[in-house]
From Swiss-Prot:
Fe cation binds at C131, H174, H178. It catalyses: N-terminal N-formyl-L-methionyl-[peptide] + H2O = N-terminal L-methionyl-[peptide] + formate. Its cofactor is Fe(2+). Binds 1 Fe(2+) ion. Removes the formyl group from the N-terminal Met of newly synthesized proteins. Requires at least a dipeptide for an efficient rate of reaction. N-terminal L-methionine is a prerequisite for activity but the enzyme has broad specificity at other positions. It comes from Streptococcus uberis (strain ATCC BAA-854 / 0140J). It holds the Pfam family Pep_deformylase. Belongs to the polypeptide deformylase family. Keywords: Hydrolase, Iron, Metal-binding, Protein biosynthesis. This is Peptide deformylase. The active site is at E175.
Length: 204
């Protein structure tokens, strides 16, 4: 049974056991585009990936299933070499503890996502990046574009173009790297991990 056949079973919930770790060759492959119109199997896979992210951000479900919190997941992390990503970025409470008007600033399953334009300005998260496929702490600035324009298809096969900046842009770039066989630490300066290039935006 393939990894995808197992994951798309109605009764299956994605857990950390389904996520492959660094060193697995699938994480270093350029993933294949999915064909359109999408197969039921690829639609279900995307929905399962989004379900995993929601579970990982729910304290009760995360504890029950033993999940690490995540804001993005790419199909290659499930040992499925396809160009499918899911991103789920929650909005935070305001300074007075009030819940946000919208629960998420970005919630999307993207098929064949592609960066079609990007800013000259670079950016990195102040606290660095982590990855569900990496079980160790890797410190340093992960240098990315501060703004990106991304084309992708949704599960209906409709094409979309979105412009992203800041944290959302970083998350989507991290996941698109996965479908291109790139790990986040490839983008850290190995000689000086906390080097700041001129004009680089540090996102707190």
């Amino acid at each position: 049974m393939s990894a995808q056949d197992k994951i798309i079973k109605a009764s299956h919930l994605i857990t950390m056991d389904d996520i492959i770790r660094e060193g697995n060759p699938t994480l270093r492959k350029e993933a294949s585009e999915v064909s359109l119109p999408l197969s039921d199997e690829d639609i279900i896979l995307g929905e399962k990936m989004m379900q995993f992210l929601k579970h990982s951000q729910d304290p009760v479900m995360a504890e029950k299933l033993g999940l690490r919190g995540g804001v993005g997941l790419a199909a290659p992390q499930l040992d499925i070499s396809k160009r499918i990503i899911a991103v789920l970025v929650p909005n935070m409470e305001d300074s007075e503890g009030n819940p946000p008007k919208e629960a998420y600033s970005l919630q999307e399953i993207m098929y064949n996502p592609k960066i079609v334009a990007h800013s000259v300005q670079e950016a990195a998260l102040a606290d660095g990046e982590g990855c569900l496929s990496v079980d160790r702490l890797v410190e340093g600035y992960v240098v990315r574009h501060s703004r990106v324009t991304v084309d992708y298809y949704d599960k209906k096969g409709d094409k979309h173009r979105i412009k992203l900046k800041g944290y959302n842009a970083i998350v989507v770039q991290h996941e698109i790297d996965h479908i291109n066989g790139i790990m986040f630490y490839d983008r850290i300066n190995s000689q000086n991990p906390f080097a700041i290039k001129e004009g680089m935006l540090i996102i707190e």
